[in-house]
C-alpha cells in the first residue's frame, strides 16, 4: 500500500520498539485499518496514546481523492464566473454594486443563503468581489434553518463544502410557527425569516444583509402586486431597516436574469434545493395544486414572452 506524507514505516509486531522516549500521540495505519486497530489497542494497554486511522490507507486515499475532486469543481465554478459567465453574471453583479452603492469600505455583510441556486451564486460572487476589490469589507455567509428536513439540511451543508463557502448556520422554528396559518403563510414566513436574519446578522456585528433576489424576482413582484394586491410595488436594490437601527438590506443580484443563473448552474452540473418549505415538500411537479401565485406569474410571463420575446 502507499504512504501518507509525514508517516514512517514500522513493524507492527515489534512496536513499541523503535519509538522515541516520549512519542506523544501515535496514529497507526495499514491497508484497510484492521491490523493497525489491533496494534493500537495493544499499545494503549501498554500505556501509549495510540489510535488507528479509520478505514486505513485506502479510506484516507478515497477522502483525498474526493477532496481533490471538490477542489477541482470549485476551481471550475470560479473560472466559469471569470470567463464564460463574466458578462452576464459577474459584470451585472458589480454594476449593481456600483450603480446602487451597495457595498462600501469597512462594511460587514451577512450574505443570506437559503441553499438555492440564487443565494449560492451570490455567495460565490461575493468571494470573487473580496478577491478583486480595492477596498476592505468583510462577509459572513449566513444560513438560517427554519425547520428544514434532514435531507435538505444535508444538501445545503454539502454544497457549501463543495463550493468552499464557509457557512454559519443557526436555527429557528419559523416553519412550525406558520404551519397552521391559513391566510398568506408565505408572506408571514418571509417577514419572519427576514427578522431572524437581521437579528442574527446584527449579533455577528454586520451592518448589512444581502439577499439573492434577481431581476426576474423584481418583475414578478411588481406583477403580483398589481394583479393580486391592487397596488404597484417593487423590490428596491437597497433598504434601510426600520426595525433594526443601523441595518441595511441590499440586493446585489438586482440586474442578473434568472435564465443566466440556470445556465451557470447547469454548465457546472450543480444541484441545489428549491423551496424547502414544509408547505411544498410535495413539489409542484408532483402536486400541481401546490403551485404558488409566483409560479402563476412566472407562467404568465413565459406565455407573454412567446408573443414578445423582448
Model regions: which residues?
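ATP-dependent adenylation/nucleotidyltransferase module used to activate substrates
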Residues: 69-224, 228-232, 236, 259-263, ...
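Short active-site oxyanion
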Residues: 5-6, 24-26, 207-208, 247-251
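Short phosphate-binding/catalytic loops that engage adenosine nucleotides
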Residues: 47-48, 165, 270
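An accessory alpha-helical subdomain
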Residues: 296-310
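Catalytic subdomain that performs nucleotidyl-dependent activation
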Residues: 139, 217-297
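A structural preference for short, hydrophobic beta-strand core positions in alpha/beta folds
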Residues: 9, 52, 141, 169-171, ...
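Rhodanese-like catalytic fold shared by cysteine-dependent sulfurtransferases
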Residues: 1-27, 31-79
Amino acid at each position: 500500500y502507499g504512504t501518507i506524507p509525514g508517516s514512517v514505516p514500522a513493524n507492527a509486531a515489534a512496536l513499541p520498539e523503535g519509538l522515541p522516549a516520549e512519542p506523544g500521540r501515535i496514529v497507526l495505519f495499514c491497508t484497510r485499518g484492521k491490523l493497525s486497530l489491533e496494534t493500537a489497542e495493544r499499545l494503549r494497554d501498554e500505556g501509549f496514546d495510540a489510535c488507528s486511522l479509520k478505514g486505513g490507507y485506502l479510506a484516507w486515499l478515497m477522502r483525498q481523492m474526493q477532496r481533490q475532486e471538490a477542489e477541482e469543481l470549485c476551481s471550475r465554478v470560479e473560472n466559469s464566473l471569470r470567463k464564460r459567465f463574466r458578462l452576464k453574471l459577474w459584470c451585472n453583479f458589480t454594476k449593481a454594486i456600483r450603480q446602487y452603492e451597495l457595498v462600501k469600505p469597512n462594511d460587514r455583510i451577512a450574505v443570506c443563503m437559503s441553499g438555492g441556486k440564487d443565494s449560492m451564486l451570490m455567495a460565490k460572487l461575493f468571494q470573487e468581489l473580496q478577491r478583486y476589490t480595492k477596498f476592505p469589507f468583510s462577509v459572513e455567509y449566513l444560513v438560517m434553518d427554519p425547520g428544514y428536513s434532514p435531507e435538505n439540511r444535508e444538501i445545503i451543508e454539502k454544497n457549501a463544502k463543495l463550493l468552499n463557502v464557509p457557512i454559519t448556520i443557526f436555527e429557528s422554528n419559523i416553519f412550525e410557527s406558520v404551519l397552521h396559518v391559513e391566510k398568506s403563510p408565505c408572506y408571514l414566513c418571509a417577514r419572519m425569516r427576514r427578522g431572524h436574519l437581521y437579528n442574527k446578522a446584527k449579533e455577528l456585528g454586520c451592518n448589512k444583509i444581502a439577499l439573492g433576489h434577481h431581476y426576474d424576482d423584481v418583475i414578478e413582484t411588481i406583477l403580483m402586486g398589481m394583479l393580486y394586491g391592487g397596488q404597484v410595488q417593487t423590490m428596491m436594490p437597497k433598504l434601510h431597516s426600520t426595525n433594526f437601527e443601523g441595518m441595511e438590506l441590499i440586493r446585489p443580484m438586482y440586474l442578473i436574469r434568472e435564465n443566466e443563473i440556470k445556465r451557470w448552474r447547469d454548465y457546472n452540473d450543480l444541484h441545489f434545493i428549491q423551496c424547502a418549505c414544509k408547505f411544498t415538500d410535495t413539489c409542484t411537479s408532483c402536486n400541481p395544486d401546490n403551485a404558488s401565485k409566483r409560479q402563476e406569474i412566472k407562467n404568465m410571463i413565459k406565455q407573454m414572452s412567446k408573443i414578445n420575446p423582448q
